[in-house]
């Protein structure tokens, strides 16, 4: 009942279709059917319910209209929206996502070729001649299988190894100690890798006694991990479609994101993305404890879902509704602690490796700081560091910049004439974190995909950013490629990084612009032809904040209270619900 394609309903061909009247729509249509003037050539359907307020891209978006012409044309003006039982929007988006996930696996396939003979545990991936770079198939999953001792069946966080140089000589830290390493991932991601390894080793054992195809164990490990990551991304698509409200088709951008092709199987970030987006869905459905559990699980896989709590806190202060948020935070903290506590107590040195590694990392090659260094010759904030010596100045600068960004977001959230949507503030928070952070690994961009779709559902703008972001992968790989005659200079790579960062900044600017002009927000407006009686949509992700009046605490200073005099915040033009990027004249 959620399809945008619908079923044609018979009606008087000489009359215009009666407009929707929200809850009274079905009754009004039924009354009209009883009139003797109806000359429908066929008997009318008994049930004429239709989700007429749903956004149909074939009617409102030039890109959607063009794609609709490929598969049979736009939605008809007499269609019953949301009545198709088979090809519902969610199933269509699942099919699209499976295609892009298959493309994502195919981009890594060249790195899954193996060498050696014998059983699977005696074969290794063939990465000779830097294949991973010139064939653009690099994935952390393959080298981590051996580097983090998973190939030996050892438990993460318990087992360690000594860091060596290219000659096999043990590395010494800046303080003279031997560099000892442990698994560098949060606990849930580490356990996921361990379970994937166990399944891969089980298959290897079975292939020795049963007539099964012999597959290199590291390749089977990748395939098992990729299967779970694909399910996690499908979960992200499902949760985004539930959060999109009447704009359910916006979630198709998550399913068909160009970033999926290159980054979905580069690392394990899809686990956290699926859990975090599901947590937002639970919040939207006013289940704060479940939201906290899912956000806590996401944070146990990757820390970034914890950032979701900050926008909720700001909106809770503005609306004066902190009870539900307190339950969410308590559930998130309890869940995170429940997952981490056993490893924290049994293997404290291994558990803390994730935090220790992030403290001592310098500015990553994808960061804005490295972009400046590549064009100016600047040596960075900490130019003379020993091996594994923490960059104290860089860490301080990154922290201060993010605090300033959070302060700006707080000011916007508390003073905007109309309360911002949860997705808008969450996108601004995560995007700010990535922009000022010293590390922006390529797969981190997956964090932004569902948030950007929910915060700024302008399809062509989002596709432009996603395409730029996805293409960063190509010069990155060829910059790392060590063949002087075929590799690219650093500036080619850092230029694309700069373009990516500018694109994200533009998205942030557009989100802020729409916060101060909610009449231009495609989510909040009722859509093309919507009636004032139907009202708009306050916030599909808002949960307890949706349609709530502002009630900030009395001790909040006046300069942090909503600015109610801004007339721009109340503008609602007749076509405000129409995508401004749509320049055509197509109408259903």
Task: Locate the predicted segments by residue.
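Start-transfer (signal-anchor) and selected internal transmembrane alpha helices
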Residues: 4-8, 15-121, 127, 222, ...
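Perimembrane helix-loop-helix junctions
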Residues: 307-337, 341, 345
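Transmembrane-helix motifs of polytopic, lipid-linked glycan transferases
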Residues: 215-247, 276, 404-412
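Specific aromatic-rich, kink-prone transmembrane helix
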Residues: 272-288
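Aromatic/glycine/proline-enriched transmembrane-helix motif characteristic
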Residues: 365-435, 517-571, 575-587
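Membrane-interface alpha helices of multi-pass inner-membrane proteins
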Residues: 259-263, 279-280, 289-314, 429-435
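Short acidic/glycine- and proline-prone juxtamembrane loop motifs at membrane-interface regions
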Residues: 264-272
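Transmembrane-helix signature of polytopic, membrane-embedded enzymes
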Residues: 237-257, 419-420
């Amino acid at each position: 009942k959620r399809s945008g394609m619908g079923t044609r309903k018979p009606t008087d061909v000489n009359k215009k279709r009666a407009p929707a009247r929200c809850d009274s729509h079905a009754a009004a249509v039924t009354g009209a059917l009883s009139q003797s003037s109806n000359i429908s050539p066929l008997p009318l359907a008994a049930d004429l319910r239709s989700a007429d307020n749903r956004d149909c891209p074939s009617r409102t978006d030039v890109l959607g209209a063009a794609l609709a012409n490929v598969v049979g044309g736009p939605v008809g003006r007499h269609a019953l929206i949301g009545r198709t039982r088979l090809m519902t929007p969610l199933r269509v988006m699942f099919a699209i996502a499976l295609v892009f996930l298959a493309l994502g696996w195919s981009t890594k396939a060249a790195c899954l070729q193996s060498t050696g003979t014998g059983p699977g545990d005696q074969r290794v991936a063939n990465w000779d001649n830097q294949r991973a770079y010139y064939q653009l198939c690099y994935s952390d999953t393959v080298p981590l299988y051996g580097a983090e001792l998973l190939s030996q069946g050892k438990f993460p966080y318990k087992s360690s190894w000594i860091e060596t140089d290219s000659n096999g000589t043990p590395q010494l830290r800046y303080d003279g100690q031997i560099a000892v390493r442990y698994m560098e991932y949060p606990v849930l991601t580490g356990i996921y890798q361990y379970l994937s390894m166990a399944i891969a080793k089980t298959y290897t054992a079975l292939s020795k006694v049963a007539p099964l195809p012999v597959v290199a164990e590291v390749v089977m490990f990748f395939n098992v991990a990729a299967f779970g990551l694909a399910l996690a991304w499908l979960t992200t698509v499902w949760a985004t479609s539930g959060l999109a409200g009447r704009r359910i088709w916006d979630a198709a951008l998550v399913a068909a994101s160009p970033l999926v092709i290159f980054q979905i199987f580069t690392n394990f970030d899809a686990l956290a993305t699926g859990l975090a987006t599901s947590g937002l869905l639970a919040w939207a459905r006013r289940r704060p404890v479940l939201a906290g559990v899912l956000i806590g699980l996401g944070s146990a896989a990757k820390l970034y879902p914890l950032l979701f709590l900050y926008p909720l806190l700001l909106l809770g202060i503005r609306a004066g509704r902190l009870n539900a948020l307190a339950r969410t935070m308590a559930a998130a903290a309890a869940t995170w602690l429940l997952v981490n506590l056993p490893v924290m107590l049994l293997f404290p040195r291994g558990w803390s490796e994730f935090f220790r590694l992030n403290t001592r990392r310098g500015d990553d090659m994808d960061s804005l700081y490295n972009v400046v260094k590549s064009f100016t010759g600047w040596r960075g904030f900490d130019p003379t560091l020993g091996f594994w010596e923490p960059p104290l100045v860089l860490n301080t600068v990154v922290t201060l910049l993010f605090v300033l960004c959070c302060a700006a977001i707080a000011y916007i959230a508390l003073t905007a004439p109309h309360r911002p949507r949860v997705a808008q503030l969450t996108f601004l928070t995560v995007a700010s974190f990535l922009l000022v952070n010293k590390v922006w690994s390529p797969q981190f961009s997956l964090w932004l995909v569902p948030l950007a779709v929910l915060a700024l559902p302008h399809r062509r703008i989002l596709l432009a950013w996603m395409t730029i972001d996805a293409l960063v992968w190509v010069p990155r790989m060829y910059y790392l490629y060590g063949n002087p005659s075929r590799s690219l200079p650093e500036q080619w790579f850092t230029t694309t990084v700069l373009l990516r960062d500018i694109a994200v900044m533009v998205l942030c600017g557009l989100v802020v612009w729409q916060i101060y002009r909610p009449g231009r927000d495609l989510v909040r407006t009722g859509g093309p032809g919507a009636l004032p009686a139907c009202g708009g949509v306050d916030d599909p992700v808002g949960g307890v904040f949706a349609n709530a009046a502002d009630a900030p605490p009395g001790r909040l200073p006046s300069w942090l209270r909503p600015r109610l005099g801004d007339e721009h915040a109340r503008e609602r033009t007749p076509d405000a619900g129409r995508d401004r990027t749509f320049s055509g004249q197509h109408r259903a």
